[in-house]
Amino acid sequence: MLSDKLKDKIGNYQDFPTTGILFRDITPILRDQKLFSELIEKMSESDILKKADCLVAIDARGFIFGSSIALNLSKPFILARKPGKLPGELIQSSYKLEYGENSLVFQLDSLKNFKSFGIIDDLLATGGTVNAVANLLNQKNKIITGLSVVVELTELNARSNFNFEVSSEVKY
């Protein structure tokens, strides 16, 4: 089963990046091209992403999966970035992390030609970054078809804060 293979690869680092956090490291998946390819194929099968006009991935590890899935599905792809990383006219939303606070921005013109968006990230923890993206999309009256992540930390129950579907390949 894919989720078991992924769990075998995911690294676990206690007290990283701060004390009390158990960091789930997805980078070993990327070193196994067969497993990475299998994961991209599986995530690409999601109706959440298939029915979206455009895919949006969250800075930075979400870009790895989002760009591959967008190519696989022949979908346009945009970035939700941290401040100071994108030029042009931007819209911004702040969020709290499990271990801090930050903001995300979109280039305003990247949203104008699309009605619906599927969100992609590597990991769902508290849901702060996803809520920031959802807030930005909602500000512009866009439809969110759902969220697709590699890993979901279910004990934090972030999915209960969303009014859209969530798909995760691995649950802890």
UniProtKB/Swiss-Prot annotation:
GO terms in the biological process aspect are: adenine salvage; AMP salvage; purine ribonucleoside salvage
Q: Does the keyword Glycosyltransferase apply?
A: yes
Against InterPro entries, the record matches this protein to: Ade_phspho_trans (IPR005764), PRibTrfase_dom (IPR000836), PRTase-like (IPR029057), UPRTase/APRTase (IPR050054)
Gene Ontology MF terms in the entry: adenine binding; adenine phosphoribosyltransferase activity; AMP binding
Q: Which domain of life is it from?
A: Bacteria
> Which E.C. number(s) belong to this protein?
2.4.2.7
Provide the Gene Ontology terms for cellular component.
Answer: cytoplasm
Query: Does Glycosyltransferase appear among the keywords?
Result: yes
How would you classify this enzyme at the top EC level?
A: transferase
**What are the alphabetically sorted keywords of the record?**
Cytoplasm, Glycosyltransferase, Purine salvage, Transferase
Task: Extract the Pfam families matched here.
Answer: Pribosyltran
Known NCBIfam families for this protein?
Answer: PRK02304.1-5
| Job of this protein | Catalyzes a salvage reaction resulting in the formation of AMP, that is energically less costly than de novo synthesis.
User: What protein family is recorded?
Assistant: Belongs to the purine/pyrimidine phosphoribosyltransferase family.
What is annotated about its quaternary structure and interactions? Answer: Homodimer.
State the protein's name: Adenine phosphoribosyltransferase
Native source species: Prochlorococcus marinus (strain MIT 9215)
Q: Which gene encodes it?
A: apt
